[in-house]
Amino acid sequence: MGSPRLGSLAGRFDPESQAAAYAAAGAAALSVVVEPDYFFGSYELLTACKAACGLPAIAKEFVVDLRQLDWAVAAGADAILLVAALYSRDELAGWARAARARGLAPLVETHDASDLELLEGEEWEMVGVNNRDLRTFEVDLAHSIAMRPRLPAQALAVAESGIATRADVDRLKSAGFDAFLVGESLLLCENPAVKLEELFG
């Protein structure tokens, strides 16, 4: 578990205990990186974390092979991340159909207006906006806020990355976001329960 920016976080905390702490503090779902090369995750990590907390689990992966969907199902995932920028419009719709056929809810991650164009012609359950530019790693919450009016009306709107304070959450709620994918500020804090209370209590 980790990121290209932070490197591996292995040994800094126990992922299963962390997942259990999230659940005890009221988290609605668990996002688990399963991509091994850049984010140091695994499907085994997802299985262990879900068993420890019982929350619905989102597998975070760069999906390019149908076997990845099958591995996610076998690991116990309930949803899968689809990074819109990796696909054409038809490819994205196809991956979403393949995920749904396996019982996985697709969370489509967008970052800019060109990604939103890929969503046209399909109904989406969940659409996220990543506040982090994966090319520069810079974070700007104003990015999500500007994108929010263009998200599909029926989709659960998820703000992703850069959420560190209650003021951030309130700002994004006011913009119309329904859910929040919080990563680093929880992973790097000393007490996840206290941090979740600070953000959402």
Could you describe each region identified by the protein language model?
Residues 26-27, 52-55, 74-80, 100-104, ...:
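Glycine-enriched alpha-helix->loop->beta-strand junction motifs that scaffold or abut catalytic
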Residues 1-2, 35, 62, 85, ...:
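Active-site beta-loop-alpha junctions enriched in small/polar residues
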Residues 146-150, 173, 186-201:
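C-terminal helical cap(s) of enzyme catalytic domains, especially alpha/beta-barrels
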Residues 4-10, 18-38, 119-148:
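Glycine/Thr-rich beta-alpha phosphate-binding loop at enzyme active sites
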Residues 34, 44-48, 52-68, 74, ...:
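Glycine- and Gly-Pro-enriched alpha-helical subdomains that act as flexible
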Residues 1-15, 56-64, 107-109, 158-163:
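Active-site mouth loops of central-metabolism enzymes
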Residues 71-91, 128-137, 177-196:
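Glycine-rich phosphate-binding active-site loops on the catalytic face of alpha/beta enzymes
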Residues 64-76, 111-123, 159, 163-182, ...:
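Catalytic cores of alpha/beta
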